[in-house]
Amino acid sequence: MSDSGAEEPRVIGIISDTHGLVRADVHTALAGVEMILHAGDVGGDDVLDELALIAPIRAVYGNTDAPGDPRLSQSIELTIGGVSIHVSHGHEVGSPTPVKLLERYSADVVVFGHTHRPLIAGGGGRLALNPGAAGPRRFDLTPSVARLTIAGGRAKAELIPLLA
């Protein structure tokens, strides 16, 4: 708490589709976050171990992750600072779109991956957030991650391009 009695903002790192690669600038992009949420297609324990050097990590399965990994969940549901968050890879709805995901999940923030396309969409106090793919460059898209800031019971997302 600050001197004014207001709660300090909570900042969560959001990453997806690493496919076995943690780029060097992920450490800078996610520095200072209290937790990292990984939306699947992790690509192995080495990725989770390296991300855990930045902050505690929770991750879900993607369509390319081996089933049965005890460090990966089907989905994650949590509440931080009064904001409910759902994390899944997105492939469970076929081709994930913000409309499909916001209809399927009731959370304030729905985090997904799979498409490799960074996206922040929503309305009515709800967000669909895809941080983009942080791993190997595919589909001529710039790799990226996101930071989710929660303050006053509201969430705001920022996409961060990865250059290295």
PLM segments and residue spans:
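N-terminal active-site segment of His-dependent metallophosphoesterases
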Residues: 1-57, 65-74, 82, 141-144, ...
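Active-site neighborhood of phospho(di)ester-bond hydrolases with catalytic His/Asp-centered motifs
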Residues: 14-16, 35-41, 58-63, 86-89, ...
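Short amphipathic alpha-helix with an adjacent loop that forms part of the alpha/beta core around
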Residues: 25-29, 79, 99-103
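Conserved beta-sheet core of the metallophosphoesterase superfamily
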Residues: 58, 91-158
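Short acidic-hydrophobic surface loop/beta-edge motif
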Residues: 74-82, 120-124
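Residues in well-ordered beta-strands of folded domains
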Residues: 79, 88, 158
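Well-ordered alpha/beta subsegment
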Residues: 161-163
